[in-house]
UniProtKB/Swiss-Prot annotation:
Organism ancestry: Bacteria, Pseudomonadati, Pseudomonadota, Gammaproteobacteria, Legionellales
NCBIfam families documented for this protein: PRK02101.1-3 (NF002542)
UniProt-listed GO biological process terms: response to hydroperoxide
Protein name according to UniProt: UPF0246 protein lpl1317
Family, per entry: Belongs to the UPF0246 family.
InterPro entries: YaaA
Any GO CC annotation of this UniProt entry: cytosol
Length: 257
């Protein structure tokens, strides 16, 4: 099984070099094509492109100006699993993982990325911001979906082909998963959703769903889950699988308040 997550906007402030084993992003050459486009943007253009405040636009302008095109491991880079710090990654809590769990995740967990396309947990990346939904003109078209769709779908098929149970588990957001061409996927796809129930009303609440996705990914990696039936047994933080509102391709979990 291969589990997919979205990245995060909030990043770790890198204060020291990561000294353990890391890997190079699989699609680094393509990512650098986008970096070269972003290096030509002014802070004002970055603000317009991503609807950012002046302060955030300046930060990301500096990030792209300082981006090392040679991807030198000593040059402000860090493993994706630890660099991302948003709600999903709070649920994932990777700092609590054992080395063997991280090693297992390296071939069973993927992170979709607007800049890097697809990342493995230990892939060394530089701080950046570039959401998948951004309308950045590039040689392939008017947005990042045009740039990444075929490439990312192909890499997913390649990785799934190496799995003992080749099923794609989608824990990514709609914005990011749209980059995957489902018609070109060669293997089954299962999407997992999390809902809150209060007074018989079901709601998906963004921040809570994000944390739950991270918790589910952690559960799958730490327990080396390799079947849908095992996924259904997830019960952290009060979430329980609901058979009535689920289907073979959509597993839905509910937490009752």
């Amino acid at each position: 099984m291969l589990t997919l997550l979205s990245p995060a906007k909030k990043l770790l402030s890198i204060s020291k070099h990561y000294s353990k084993k890391t890997s190079n992003p699989l699609l680094l050459d393509k990512a650098l094509e986008l970096v070269k486009i972003m290096k030509l943007k002014s802070a004002e253009q970055i603000a317009d492109l991503m609807d950012l405040s002046r302060q955030l636009a300046e930060l990301n302008y500096e990030r792209y100006q300082n981006f090392d095109l040679k991807n030198n491991p000593m040059n402000h880079s860090y493993p994706a699993l630890f660099l991302f710090q948003g709600d999903v990654y709070q649920g994932l809590n990777a700092n609590s993982w054992k080395d063997e769990e991280i090693e297992y995740a390296q071939s069973h967990l993927g992170i979709l990325s607007g800049l890097y396309g697809f990342l493995r947990p230990l892939d060394r990346i530089q701080p950046y911001r570039l959401e998948m939904g951004v309308k950045l003109e590039n040689p392939a078209g008017k947005n990042l979906y045009a740039f990444w769709s075929k490439i990312v779908t192909n890499i997913l098929n390649q990785i799934l082909a190496e799995q003992s149970n080749p099923v794609l588990i989608n824990l990514a957001s709609t914005e990011y998963f749209k980059v995957v061409d489902e018609k070109k996927l060669s293997y089954p796809l299962v999407t997992i959703n999390f809902y809150e129930q209060k007074n018989s009303e079901l709601k998906m609440i963004g921040i809570l769903a994000k944390k739950a996705r991270g918790m589910m990914a952690k559960y799958i990696m730490q327990n080396r889950i390799d079947s849908i039936e095992q996924i259904k047994e997830f019960s952290e933080s009060g979430y329980l699988f609901n058979k009535e509102i689920s289907s073979p391709n959509s597993l839905n979990f509910i937490r009752i308040h």
